[in-house]
A protein has these predicted regions:
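N-terminal cap/leader regions of alpha/beta-hydrolase-fold enzymes
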Residues: 1-242
Length: 242
């Protein structure tokens, strides 16, 4: 797999996203814009991006936390504070997210990697909530997939959603971080907005079932089999979307 670090600036701050793709495969592929979990851009999230990309996609991974954040050691309290700070700041999510997507797309097009007509988005955990904010604000992705999403509901509940594409949420029925009422509210929002949506609810699954090393039952537990099944569902969803 190949990786390229892509720098960009937003509001006077420096960020570094990443392109991830299989360089043994020729030709243009769909571009999948990825909002990683609260660890940010690091070896952990690069590994997830590589799994997602496979031979099928080029992953454009956004950095929403700033240069060096991902590789720095952090306590859980620091992770939570940073992630919540980003998640609550809707203007930052939309502004920095748009700049990240533009910079990553420009770099991918420079290398002839992507088909600009086939654009999707994904997000893991807190990144899933961030991705949903982008698409409900009108970001033009043909399909969006969120895995064990955190805070799926809008910061600005009074705003009229402007979804452009399909949505798939892959979730754990026993996820205490994002319990059923939150997912029910997301379902109602998507239905009300006329979105072509799907929600796959895995029985007994907790939060972070795609995060290797997660082991804090009953809150979050990695499940390799469910994660692989999730990626198959994602691929099937995008195959029918593009």
């Amino acid at each position: 797999m190949a990786e390229i670090t892509v720098p960009y600036e937003y509001d006077g701050r420096q960020f570094e996203g990443m392109l991830v793709w299989d360089d043994s495969v020729a030709g243009q592929r769909p571009a999948i814009f990825m909002q990683p979990d609260w660890f940010g851009v690091c070896r952990h999230s690069a590994g997830m991006a590589s799994e997602v990309a496979g031979r099928d996609y080029v992953v454009l991974m956004a950095d929403m936390y700033g240069v060096g954040y991902g590789e720095r050691e952090k306590t859980e309290a620091e992770l939570l504070a940073s992630a919540q700070g980003v998640r609550r700041d809707l203007p930052f999510i939309l502004g920095c997210g748009a700049v990240a997507h533009a910079a990553l797309t420009e770099e991918a097009e420079k290398h002839g990697l992507i088909d600009p007509e086939r654009r999707g988005a994904i997000g893991f955990c807190m990144g899933g909530g961030i991705a949903l904010e982008q698409v409900r604000a009108g970001a033009d992705f043909k399909g969006t997939v969120v895995f064990h999403v955190t805070l799926p509901n809008p910061v600005d509940a009074a705003a009229t959603p402007d979804f452009k594409g399909r949505v798939l949420a892959i979730h754990g029925a026993a996820d205490p971080v994002t319990p059923k009422p939150m997912m029910d509210a997301l379902e109602a929002e998507l239905t009300g907005a006329g979105v072509d949506w799907q929600i796959m609810n895995f029985g007994h699954a907790t939060h972070s079932f795609c995060v290797e090393g997660a082991n804090n039952p009953p809150v979050q537990v990695y499940d390799e089999a469910l994660c692989r099944q999730s990626y198959r569902l994602m691929r099937d969803f995008f195959t029918h979307t593009f």
